[in-house]
């Protein structure tokens, strides 16, 4: 699991920013304060590792994330034409650190090229590796890259994006080994190709989160798969998703992706609360915490919901997860430092109490109540 992310001159982070990560980490704060940039840095590495089994070239446009040109990700006030992304991680047997410096590519504006890499405090520039080293030294560098736990762990990431789609009634059949995309596509193919237990687990989970659900898959056609659902459990009548509450189809990809996430993997989720009643948001967080504990699943969640935060607090209070395995990161901005984000770690104690309540953190209801009482 990742324990730290370090950014420098990447997007809004002009100076080096160390971002602690726990088994369950919630990124919280006003819009435009750097939360998405944190996720995007990790997802860029994931995208390059997933598609090329390497991070020597960082592809800024791909099937996971699209950030545009190199100049779009380099901090606007950068003193050098480079940015760096660092990671720290641990497994049962070892800890690992990785820091990569990237600069612009000569041949394309949509790729960042590795300039220097530091693995477990041992540095080697990419240019030296390719121009000045012997073949034996070059092989050692390649080996050290392939042995990096932090790099290999990138392959364990699953991502559900903020701009995900609600499930459609019909999907073209794509065959085996289909994955759910960041936008939530292919979920019907995954349900159809998996064991019947997965469909039942998804139905039970949806029912618990949304206070009732029935799911049925029509898997008999050769070229397509259909889904029907209802907002009542064990319903004899099911309907196209468009004719049931939108939240049902919208949340399905997240629920299924969580259920199929392998042991010890990583799930990155943006705005899980979207289109859900506050009570459903709380129960969704209970579901996510349960899955995290059962499978040692690392959750990195960006959210604007007090109910998501409180869901983690309640889980700690009920001793479903240790307080040491959770953290809340509050993102704010100091106008005196020209918009540089500030990241404050808020701790949850054993009783679910929070270590601090900074401005704009879970205080909107209090602000509104004060106006109502004037």
Segments (PLM) and residue ranges:
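Pre-Walker A-like glycine/lysine-rich segment at the N-terminus of P-loop NTPase domains
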Residues: 1-50, 54-59
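Phosphate-coordinating catalytic segments in nucleotide- and nucleic-acid-processing enzymes
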Residues: 4-6, 48-252, 257, 262, ...
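Phosphate-binding P-loop
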Residues: 16-22, 258-263, 290-294
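C-terminal lobe/lid and adjacent interdomain/linker elements of RecA-like ASCE P-loop ATPase modules
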Residues: 77, 283-374
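Walker B catalytic acidic pair
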Residues: 270-271
């Amino acid at each position: 699991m990742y324990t730290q992310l370090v950014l420098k001159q990447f997007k809004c982070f002009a100076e080096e920013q160390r971002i602690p990560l726990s088994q369950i980490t919630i990124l919280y704060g006003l819009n435009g304060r750097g939360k998405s940039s944190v996720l995007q840095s990790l997802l860029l590495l994931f995208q390059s590792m997933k598609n090329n089994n390497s991070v020597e070239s960082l592809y800024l446009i791909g099937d996971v994330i699209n950030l545009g040109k190199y100049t779009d990700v380099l901090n606007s006030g950068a003193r050098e034409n480079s940015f760096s992304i660092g990671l720290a991680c641990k497994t049962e047997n070892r800890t690992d650190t990785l820091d990569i410096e990237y600069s612009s590519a000569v041949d394309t504006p949509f790729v960042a090229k590795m300039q220097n890499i530091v693995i477990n405090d041992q540095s080697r520039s990419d240019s030296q590796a390719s121009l000045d080293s012997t073949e034996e030294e070059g092989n050692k560098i390649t080996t050290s890259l392939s042995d990096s736990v932090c790099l290999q762990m990138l392959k364990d990431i699953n991502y559900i994006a903020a701009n995900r789609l609600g499930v459609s009634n019909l999907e073209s059949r794509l065959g085996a080994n289909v994955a759910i995309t960041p936008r939530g596509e292919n979920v019907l193919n995954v349900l159809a190709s998996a064991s019947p237990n997965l469909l039942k687990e998804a139905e039970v989970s949806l029912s618990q989160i949304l206070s009732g659900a029935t799911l049925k898959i029509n898997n008999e056609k050769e070229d397509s798969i259909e889904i029907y659902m209802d907002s009542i459990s064990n319903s004899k009548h099911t309907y196209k998703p468009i004719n049931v509450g939108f939240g049902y189809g919208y949340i399905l990809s997240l629920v299924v992706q969580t259920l199929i996430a392998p042991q010890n993997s990583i799930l990155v989720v943006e705005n899980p609360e979207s289109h859900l009643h506050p009570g459903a948001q709380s129960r969704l967080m209970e579901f996510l915490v349960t899955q995290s504990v059962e499978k040692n699943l690392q959750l990195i969640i960006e959210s604007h919901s007090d109910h998501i935060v409180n869901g983690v607090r309640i889980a700690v209070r009920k001793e479903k997860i240790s307080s040491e395995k959770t953290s809340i990161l509050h993102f704010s901005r100091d106008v005196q430092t020209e918009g540089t984000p500030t990241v404050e770690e808020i701790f949850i104690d054993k009783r679910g109490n929070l270590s601090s309540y900074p401005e704009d953190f879970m205080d909107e209801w209090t602000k509104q109540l004060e106006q109502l009482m004037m």
